[in-house]
């Protein structure tokens, strides 16, 4: 396990000869060597991989059982110099009883043996014909490969600080899998040795089962099933190998391959520890029988320079087009239903929204339109107010008007220049002073207009600020920070853009679609400073606070995974390789940390708004933080990277 908590694991599917133990263990040794070269720390082979699963009644023959034990002993010795831990399946006798077992070994030593608990005897499965259940066995020893090892279903293993547990095939398919108890007892990785034949539709179910069990146990789950080489007398084995982590499949093998396969992934034990700390329900899991933890230190092997793990630079936005469209539809529904519920509760039939021609106010308006349609209210009850100021450009002004007209809402225009100039005179601010007061006064003037119009009309002010702005505090306190209901408060900027594009792609009106596309093409800006001489936007948000794609990346992994600055940099430098170098990543991470801590007071007073995802900053919900917390520990860690 590396300094960031990544553990490199593998599911190894070797060539196999049914009953040919020498050949089978030779192939295992070869794959173990390959795994070591790739920096793997723990690798698992299929169920009964030493003999083959489909030996049938030959499993009762002493000749095969002796051959399996001898061949396994050679495998243990052949891999003794490899810096990794291996898990292999073989039949083992204990007294007069035969068990379907998983043996854990490293450095020439067998650490322990786990018997299969659930022995299936239905459909194509006849395991009770040969094997007994190992459920409940604890505190015993078993002879294997000339060694005596711990034997039982109460075993977990800790190698270089990484604790893992084992279950075998059918163990996963029951109401309470052993892995649930092992995880509750501390195991963060579960290895499953399997020999599961293919039938139509089973693979999809298996993928869901593995993913769900990893989510339910807040663990990494490494599943390795027998492949090409098992007998096809009545069954076909496709060589399924899956590595999942907390509900997400990280890697999987090619099915029905005639080649040996080594599926490798880095699983994030540090993140799993964080998830278990924050998940109070996991901590309340049913008490488990006392587990026996077998500890072992293994010499550090080859640590691959590249992570065997996909680092998504856009964690809020699905890459797959179909899933992205489904995500946008779901988010849009949550937003609009939240607003609809608030409108119905307050008996408001009017909504007031400031429309700037930018992304956030556009999304808020689209959400309001959907909410009004859902409630059967007249869209003219939506009062879209454009409030041109000192920095408003022709482009955003035009887009604001065209969008409102295209959607059929009530359009109002209330310029703020004169009111702001009068305010500057009242407080003694020279109009040429371009300080924060100059900018914030405009934002507060706009909010005052919206609030007063809402009072006049008996309406509700719909907030437009998004999650990214809340994280950075990129809003004027008691200005655009305030509303009566903030529909975008849980939507990050990177997702806002895709939501608007999704609406544009489905828009029936060509003019409205063209307006939405032009809004998408407009630089993000608060437009609080006068435009350039050519009329273009002078104030670009991402030039001032940094790229939103970086900030959303930091925000997601800081809140959702609990990563510190060092790990955030490590991952961001890989996720954004080719677009943002290390210096850029560290610069903007420093900005993110400083602003996130210093601007909490704005979030502490934020209005109500719907939660749409697992990352949100409502002080009444997912994020509790004092407004006067110090950022020094995080900044100090960041400084050590420079």
Identify the residue ranges that each predicted region occupies:
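Enzyme catalytic cores with a strong preference for nitrogen-chemistry domains
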Residues: 1-354, 370-379, 411
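ATP/NTP-dependent adenylation/nucleotidyl-transfer catalytic domains that generate, transfer
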Residues: 24, 160, 219, 231, ...
């Amino acid at each position: 396990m590396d300094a960031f908590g990544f553990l490199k694991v593998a599911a190894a599917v070797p060539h196999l000869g049914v009953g040919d133990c020498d050949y089978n263990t030779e192939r295992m040794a070869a794959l173990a060597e390959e795994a070591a070269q790739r920096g793997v720390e723990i690798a698992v082979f299929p169920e009964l991989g030493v003999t083959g699963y489909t030996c049938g009644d030959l499993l009762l023959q002493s000749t095969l059982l002796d051959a399996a034990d001898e061949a396994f002993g050679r495998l243990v010795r052949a891999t003794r110099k490899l810096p990794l831990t291996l898990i292999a399946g073989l039949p083992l006798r204990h007294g007069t009883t035969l068990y379907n077992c998983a043996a854990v070994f490293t450095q020439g030593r067998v650490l322990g043996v786990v018997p299969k608990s659930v022995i299936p005897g239905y459909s194509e499965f006849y395991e009770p014909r040969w094997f007994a259940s190992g459920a409940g066995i604890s505190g015993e020893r078993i002879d294997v490969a000339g060694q005596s090892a711990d034997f039982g279903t109460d075993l977990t293993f800790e190698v270089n600080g990484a604790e893992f547990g084992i279950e075998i095939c059918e163990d996963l398919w029951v109401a309470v899998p052993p892995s649930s108890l092992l995880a509750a007892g501390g195991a963060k990785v579960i290895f499953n040795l399997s020999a599961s034949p293919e039938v139509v539709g089973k693979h999809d179910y298996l993928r869901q089962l593995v993913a769900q069990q990893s989510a339910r146990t807040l663990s990494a789950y490494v599943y390795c099933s027998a492949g090409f080489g098992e007998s096809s007398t009545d069954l076909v084995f496709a060589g399924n190998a899956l590595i999942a982590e907390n509900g997400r499949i990280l890697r999987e093998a090619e099915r029905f391959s005639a080649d040996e396969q080594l599926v490798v992934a880095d699983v994030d034990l540090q993140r799993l520890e964080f998830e278990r700390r924050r998940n109070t329900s996991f901590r309340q899991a049913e008490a488990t029988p006392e587990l026996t933890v077998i500890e072992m230190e293994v010499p550090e092997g080859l640590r691959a320079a590249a992570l065997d793990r996909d680092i998504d630079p856009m964690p809020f936005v699905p890459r797959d087009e179909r899933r992205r469209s489904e995500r946008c539809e779901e988010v849009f529904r949550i937003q609009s239903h939240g607003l609809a519920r608030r409108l119905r509760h307050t008996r408001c039939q009017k909504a007031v929204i400031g429309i700037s021609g930018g992304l956030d106010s556009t999304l808020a308006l689209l959400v309001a339109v959907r909410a009004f349609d859902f409630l059967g209210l007249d869209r003219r009850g939506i009062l879209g107010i454009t409030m041109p100021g000192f920095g408003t450009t022709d482009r955003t002004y035009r887009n604001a008007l065209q969008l409102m007209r295209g959607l059929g809402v009530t359009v109002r225009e209330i310029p703020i220049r004169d009111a702001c100039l009068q305010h500057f005179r009242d407080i003694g601010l020279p109009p040429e002073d371009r300080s924060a007061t100059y900018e914030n006064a405009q934002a507060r003037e706009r909010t005052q207009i919206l609030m007063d119009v809402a009072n006049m009309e008996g309406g509700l002010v719909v907030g437009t600020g998004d999650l990214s702005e809340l994280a950075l505090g990129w809003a004027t306190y008691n200005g655009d920070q305030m509303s009566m209901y903030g529909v975008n408060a849980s939507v990050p900027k990177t997702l806002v853009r895709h939501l608007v594009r999704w609406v544009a792609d489905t828009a029936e009106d060509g003019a409205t679609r063209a307006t939405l596309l032009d809004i998408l093409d407009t630089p993000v800006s608060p437009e609080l400073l006068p435009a350039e001489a050519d009329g273009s936007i002078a104030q670009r948000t991402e030039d001032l606070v940094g790229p939103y794609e970086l900030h959303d990346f930091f925000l997601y992994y800081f809140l959702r995974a609990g990563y510190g600055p060092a790990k955030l940099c490590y991952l961001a430098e890989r996720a954004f390789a080719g677009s943002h170098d290390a210096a850029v990543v560290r610069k903007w991470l420093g900005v993110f940390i400083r602003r996130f801590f210093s601007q909490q007071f704005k979030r502490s007073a934020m209005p109500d708004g719907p939660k749409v995802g697992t990352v949100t900053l409502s002080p009444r919900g997912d994020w509790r933080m004092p407004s006067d917390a110090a950022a020094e520990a995080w900044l100090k860690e960041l400084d050590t990277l420079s």
